[in-house]
């Protein structure tokens, strides 16, 4: 493919730009470059529409672009800088730094489009990733090198949970992390950057970020759909370099996968494709598969990914979240009804799943305690209609005991977060998985039936609940 072939813009429709070439046509997914004033604008070829014209998607605003402007074909896909030099920096979808700390000092780049690792290159592990969050570690544990989805509607705590996971896992994790901000709030991206600096995960020296452990790639809500659709791939390309070339175990955080799908739907409509169910692009499953299949662990290294996934109108059967489900090893589902009770994290203990909850992986004791906790909560759920109509007095003694324990378990699944300390005033708690299993085993066995419900709310281990009960009695 010849580089530096030039064409001219014939039509601009918002983020969609048509470019006509006299000579060779660029390939689909090639990056084209043009100048708008003093800035570089990258276009990605999406379609060939005849008459030597290609239809492209802009990766930035097309304000100031005019018909007749010259466009150069780079001869390759969008390429972003990769390697240790990206750590401690904030980049955009095309790999340009946006943190006002000068250019990235590397000539190493990698194209954002590539094949997923082949079947024989892939590797799986059966090692648990401890998060320090009780409800996750007990009922839907995460696997090292696995894919984790945090599902939830608007305002139930996905971003807070992903930030707590960054706090608990990334800070104690020896390797590197990559965070892709896909179509979310710029303010949250800014807060995360400063939190990472405060925590020492990003080290800012005089003109250097040496010693940093995380690279940030942002394509936020105000960006055009092309940028939001591709920024996840840009972040993933950086994570793949650390996995493949340096053999590292990488943590890859994405907030939010739904915005990737949403941007794909916008682009699809702009390109004139006939939409499928609920207005999504007809290629929804293909687009999701192209991204998700690359997020995997190989014999060289691993990528453990944590993805926040917005659920439109709290409907888990919506095509966007439903398409994500099949790619994940563990799902943590956040429930508005639990958030309304003031129980945070608002994780639904009966709706969250993990393929790691297996006695061969977590051990017999952990598995049995988790299943007993779910059995008690399920019994309570099925009794709620009877309680609502007839009241607690009509229940048998056994059922009353089940309800009392379930309410204590529900409250004990709450936990103060480190990242929410400034709002709650309660110091965050990291609970080791052994303490979590031991505490819930004792509650299920009835050893703490005498403690009041309030003692179990927003504490760490069972010992903290006992102390809280004593202080409640003292003030009563």
Curated annotation (Swiss-Prot):
Gene3D superfamilies registered for this protein in UniProt: 2.40.10.170, Bovine Mitochondrial F1-atpase, Atp Synthase Beta Chain, Chain D, domain 3, P-loop containing nucleotide triphosphate hydrolases
InterPro entries membership: AAA+_ATPase (IPR003593), ATP-synt_VA_C (IPR055190), ATP_synth_F1_bsu (IPR005722), ATPase_a/bsu_AS (IPR020003), ATPase_alpha/beta_chains (IPR050053), ATPase_F1/V1/A1_a/bsu_N (IPR004100), ATPase_F1/V1/A1_a/bsu_N_sf (IPR036121), ATPase_F1/V1/A1_a/bsu_nucl-bd (IPR000194)
Molecular-function GO terms, alphabetical: ATP binding; ATP hydrolysis activity; proton-transporting ATP synthase activity, rotational mechanism
UniProtKB keywords: ATP synthesis, ATP-binding, Cell inner membrane, Cell membrane, CF(1), Hydrogen ion transport, Ion transport, Membrane, Nucleotide-binding, Translocase, Transport
Subcellular location: Cell inner membrane
Entry membrane topology: Peripheral membrane protein
GO cellular component: plasma membrane; proton-transporting ATP synthase complex
Pfam family, one: ATP-synt_VA_C
Catalytic reactions on record: ATP + H2O + 4 H(+)(in) = ADP + phosphate + 5 H(+)(out)
SUPFAM superfamilies for this protein: C-terminal domain of alpha and beta subunits of F1 ATP synthase (SSF47917), N-terminal domain of alpha and beta subunits of F1 ATP synthase (SSF50615), P-loop containing nucleoside triphosphate hydrolases (SSF52540)
Amino-acid positions noted as binding ATP in the UniProt annotation, renumbered to this chain: 152-159
Predominant subcellular localization, coarse grouping: membrane
Keyword Protein transport tagged: no
EC annotation from Swiss-Prot or TrEMBL: 7.1.2.2
Coiled coil, from the record: none
UniProt-listed CDD domains: ATP-synt_F1_beta_C (cd18110), ATP-synt_F1_beta_N (cd18115), F1-ATPase_beta_CD (cd01133)
Subunit: F-type ATPases have 2 components, CF(1) - the catalytic core - and CF(0) - the membrane proton channel. CF(1) has five subunits: alpha(3), beta(3), gamma(1), delta(1), epsilon(1). CF(0) has three main subunits: a(1), b(2) and c(9-12). The alpha and beta chains form an alternating ring which encloses part of the gamma chain. CF(1) is attached to CF(0) by a central stalk formed by the gamma and epsilon chains, while a peripheral stalk is formed by the delta and b chains.
Family as reported in the entry's similarity comment: Belongs to the ATPase alpha/beta chains family.
Function in brief: Produces ATP from ADP in the presence of a proton gradient across the membrane. The catalytic sites are hosted primarily by the beta subunits.
This protein's name: ATP synthase subunit beta
Organism field: Acidiphilium cryptum (strain JF-5)
Species classification: Bacteria, Pseudomonadati, Pseudomonadota, Alphaproteobacteria, Acetobacterales
Name of the gene this protein is made from: atpD
């Amino acid at each position: 493919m010849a580089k530096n072939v030039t064409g001219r813009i014939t039509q601009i429709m918002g983020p969609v730009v048509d470019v006509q070439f006299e000579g060779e046509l660029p390939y689909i997914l090639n990056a084209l470059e043009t100048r708008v004033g003093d800035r570089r604008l990258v276009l990605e070829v999406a379609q060939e529409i005849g008459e030597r014209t290609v239809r492209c998607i802009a990766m930035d605003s097309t304000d100031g672009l005019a018909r007749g402007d010259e466009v150069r074909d780079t001869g390759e896909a969008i390429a972003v800088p990769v390697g240790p030099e990206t750590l401690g920096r904030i980049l955009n979808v095309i790999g340009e730094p946006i943190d006002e700390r000068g250019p990235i000092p590397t000539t190493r780049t990698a194209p954002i489009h590539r094949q997923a690792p082949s079947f024989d290159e892939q590797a799986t592990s059966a090692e648990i990733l401890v998060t320090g969050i009780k409800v996750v570690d007990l009922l839907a544990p995460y696997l090292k090198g696995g894919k984790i989805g945090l599902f939830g509607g608007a305002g139930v705590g996905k971003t807070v949970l992903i930030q707590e996971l960054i706090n608990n896992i990334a800070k104690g994790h020896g390797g590197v992390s990559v965070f892709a901000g896909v179509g979310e709030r710029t303010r949250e991206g800014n807060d995360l950057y400063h939190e990472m600096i405060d925590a020492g995960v990003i080290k800012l020296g005089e003109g250097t970020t040496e010693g940093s452990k995380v690279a940030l790639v942002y394509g936020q809500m105000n960006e055009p759909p092309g940028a939001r659709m591709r920024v996840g791939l840009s972040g993933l390309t950086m994570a793949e370099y650390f996995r493949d070339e340096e053999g590292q175990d990488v943590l890859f955080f994405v907030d939010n996968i739904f915005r990737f799908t949403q941007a794909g739907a916008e682009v699809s409509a702009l390109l004139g494709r006939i939409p499928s169910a609920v207005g999504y692009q007809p290629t929804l499953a293909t687009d999701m598969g192209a991204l998700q299949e690359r997020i995997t662990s190989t014999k060289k290294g691993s990528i453990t990914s944590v993805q926040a996934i917005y659920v439109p109108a709290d409907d888990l059967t919506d095509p966007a979240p439903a398409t994500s489900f099949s790619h994940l090893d563990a799902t943590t589902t956040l429930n508005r009804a639990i958030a309304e009770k003031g129980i945070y994290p608002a994780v639904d203990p009966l709706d969250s799943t993990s393929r790691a909850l297996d006695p061969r992986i977590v051990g017999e004791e952990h598995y049995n305690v988790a299943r007993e906790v779910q059995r008690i909560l399920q019994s309570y759920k099925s009794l709620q209609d009877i309680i609502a109509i007839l009241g607690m007095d009509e229940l048998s003694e056994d059922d009353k005991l089940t309800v009392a324990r379930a309410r204590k378990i529900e409250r004990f699944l709450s936990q103060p977060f480190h990242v929410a300390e400034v709002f709650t005033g309660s110091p965050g708690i990291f609970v080791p998985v052994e303490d979590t299993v031991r505490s819930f085993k004792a509650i299920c066995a009835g050893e703490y039936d005498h403690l009041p419900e309030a003692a179990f709310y927003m504490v760490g281990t069972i010992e903290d609940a006992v102390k809280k009960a004593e202080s409640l009695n003292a003030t009563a």
